[in-house]
Amino acid sequence: MYDISGWKHVFKLDPNKELSDEHLEMICESGTDAVIVGGSDGVTIDNVLHMLVSIRRYAVPCVLEVSNVEAITPGFDFYYIPSVLNSRKVEWVTGVHHEALKEFGDIMDWDEIFMEGYCVLNPEAKVAQLTDAKCDVTEDDVIAYARLADKLLRLPIFYLEYSGTYGDVELVKNVKAQLKQAKLYYGGGISNAEQAKEMAQHADTVVVGNIIYDDIKAALKTVKAVKGE
């Protein structure tokens, strides 16, 4: 079994986006610590299975970040369950999770499941609109969400999600200083190695996503930038 606490760099692949076999191989053989499969819309059992089968040709750990209960399938190493802490809708905090546990609770392998406390900070992002996230927040608000995840809920992951725009480095630094046991994931807007390296100075794990589809070479360079190799 893999130890997620040591992951510094992960790629996130959207099953609803096209990725050539050649580029998928580059991603999986890049030296990244893991590949997360997940997206905000268009996630189906068919495209998740296609992605799983494709990734399983390689040795890299793979994680399903669950956004659609109907698209859950066995075969992933881990399952990340996001709870959007700054959502205005309870369904995205605990509601969907409650329904899933009613249906699948008896067959879930809890050693494979990790809850993520999300704080979504880009109001233009699909995930913000889908979950009705309250993005007009102060640094004190974000730190309070971090403490909620880390100290009250004891979640293993606190995820700062800027999704599509590069985040506030000073905020990321200050959030990291508040966390005692939760790992800080950062995702959003990383388009080059320099940005990846900058965020890696503060976040435990840097998530690289959209740039995969825009500039594969730039995406691959983020691995060494983050891991210092």
Swiss-Prot record:
Pathway: Membrane lipid metabolism; glycerophospholipid metabolism. GO terms for biological process: glycerophospholipid biosynthetic process. Keywords: Lipid biosynthesis, Lipid metabolism, Magnesium, Metal-binding, Phospholipid biosynthesis, Phospholipid metabolism, Transferase. CDD domains: PcrB_like (cd02812). The keyword Ribosomal protein does not apply. Mg(2+) binds at D14, S40. Its cofactor is Mg(2+). Pfam families: PcrB. Prenyltransferase that catalyzes in vivo the transfer of the heptaprenyl moiety of heptaprenyl pyrophosphate (HepPP; 35 carbon atoms) to the C3 hydroxyl of sn-glycerol-1-phosphate (G1P), producing heptaprenylglyceryl phosphate (HepGP). This reaction is an ether-bond-formation step in the biosynthesis of archaea-type G1P-based membrane lipids found in Bacillales. Homodimer. Belongs to the GGGP/HepGP synthase family. Group I subfamily. This is Heptaprenylglyceryl phosphate synthase. It comes from Bacillus cereus (strain AH187). The lineage of its organism: Bacteria, Bacillati, Bacillota, Bacilli, Bacillales. The gene is pcrB.
